[in-house]
């Protein structure tokens, strides 16, 4: 990469998590279990949506892409964290660090856009049920997914190229468990004002606006539900919306707090814990919150298991 001609260091050292040596094995087992849960949960959703024709709908198109994004998002950081905890080798080459940052931004941004698309899909389904199929046409759904991929690719590449132009002189210790963009900027010995402005401006477009759109969609959904005189339906809707919004708030809240509204006296431990929330916890919770609890997914799982009795049906 072009940044290697402008830097005097060839690798970085990831300090990882502030864990006591006697707690190392326990934490390793915990994060491994969480990572495997994320992988299996999201893979199950992708496979079920692929195999069951009843799930070939706009909502599940977005869900399958979200599951793929969550799977990749966790895989960008957690395997390296587990490797460092096991081998006690915190080094990561310069090029690998920028590559990790690129894919971290790519799949993190992709999740942000997909969450907006899913909120819009639910808004149309609940507020305009008679026009749902006309509004959420296959062409619109595919266009939303394709646009999400294009925008996130551009955004991730922009930040990576801006990072590659910076000089890193002496300090190569990253007090984090992955190559976090803000942590790298603190190590740079050249002017980072352009990077910081791009983070602030693009962050508003990629994070804040989608978050507000999601909140607006759910507000309209709740308003529409309250007009229906059904206490059972209202309780179920509030339960669903509440669980969705809790995960969405966890994802966006930690990102906004870390990158757009950083505290001057924020500790490394606090930043690491916040990062764990949206890199490890959210991707693990999404399959259970959005998919595995609902009737359609349970029905699809039963149908797929039944088909296994006759492999020619698959």
Curated annotation (Swiss-Prot):
It is found in: Cell membrane. It is a multi-pass membrane protein. Residues 1-25, 80-100, 159-196, 261-272 are extracellular. It comes from the Eukaryota. GO terms for biological process: signal transduction. Its main location: membrane. Disulfide bonds join 97-189. GO terms for cellular component: plasma membrane. Residues 50-57, 121-139, 220-236, 293-314 are cytoplasmic. GO terms for molecular function: G protein-coupled receptor activity; olfactory receptor activity. The keyword Endoplasmic reticulum does not apply. The chain crosses the membrane at residues 26-49, 58-79, 101-120, 140-158, 197-219, 237-260, 273-292. Glycans are attached at residues 5, 265. InterPro entries: GPCR_Rhodpsn, GPCR_Rhodpsn_7TM, Olfact_rcpt. Keywords: Cell membrane, Disulfide bond, G-protein coupled receptor, Glycoprotein, Membrane, Olfaction, Receptor, Sensory transduction, Transducer, Transmembrane, Transmembrane helix. Belongs to the G-protein coupled receptor 1 family. Odorant receptor. This is Olfactory receptor 1E5. It comes from Pan troglodytes. The gene is OR1E5.
